[in-house]
Design a protein with these regions (language model features):
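Short, glycine/polar-rich helix-capping loops at beta-to-alpha or helix-loop-helix junctions
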Residues: 124-135
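Alpha-helical substrate-recognition element adjacent to the catalytic core
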Residues: 1-19, 32
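Substrate-recognition "cap/lid" segment bordering the active-site pocket of phosphatases
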Residues: 26-27, 54-102, 106-115, 129-131
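Glycine-rich phosphate-binding loop signature in dinucleotide/nucleotide-binding domains
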Residues: 42-45, 93-97, 154-158
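Short acidic-hydrophobic, aromatic-tinged amphipathic segments that line or gate anion-handling sites
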Residues: 139-143
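Short, acidic loop-to-helix structural element flanking the phosphoryl-transfer center
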Residues: 18-49, 55-62, 84, 144
Length: 158
């Protein structure tokens, strides 16, 4: 809760995290067309999913919606985004020396910058274009059906 002291925050998180892990599929589904775009991309690139959600929830959601992809959520000992550590861990796990980060928030743009990789900011998610431009976003994708094409264009630049 906003303005809460650290002890209250920890108490809330102690209740929330296990609840969310057990109920994370409620009102959650891939965006329309996303699975088809990932099918195109996985033919050419390894794919990993990195989230600040609890690791158990990320793995459960990925098992349901994105089976076969490496998934990493918040784990003890690995700093959360926007620190680059989770991105580096995912890149190592999938054997990627280069990467393009796909995100829908300012935190994602900053995470990619901290990791030294380009970020493709999608405009159907959490934040709007102005929010992401305010923190330096350069690449944008407006529709899920354009995702694979946008990734290939960025990949061709490095």
């Amino acid at each position: 809760p906003e303005g809460a002291d650290a002890e209250t925050v920890q108490k809330v998180l102690a209740v929330y995290k296990p609840y969310y892990t057990d109920h994370c599929q409620i009102k959650t589904a891939p965006y329309a067309g996303m699975l088809q775009q990932l099918d195109v991309l996985k033919e050419k690139y390894p794919i990993a999913i990195v989230s600040n959600k609890p690791d158990s929830a990320v793995k459960a959601l990925c098992a349901d919606f994105f089976p076969g992809y490496y998934a990493l959520g918040e784990v003890s000992g690995c700093p959360r985004k926007p620190a680059p550590d989770m991105v580096y861990k995912a890149m190592e796990a999938i054997g990627a020396e280069k990467a393009i980060y796909i995100g829908d928030s300012e935190v994602d743009v900053i995470t990619a910058r901290n990791a030294g990789i380009p970020c493709l900011s999608v405009l159907w998610g959490f934040r709007d274009k102005a929010d992401m431009e305010a923190v330096g976003a350069e690449y944008f994708c407006e529709k899920t059906e354009n995702l694979a094409t946008a990734i290939v264009k960025i990949a061709d630049t490095f």
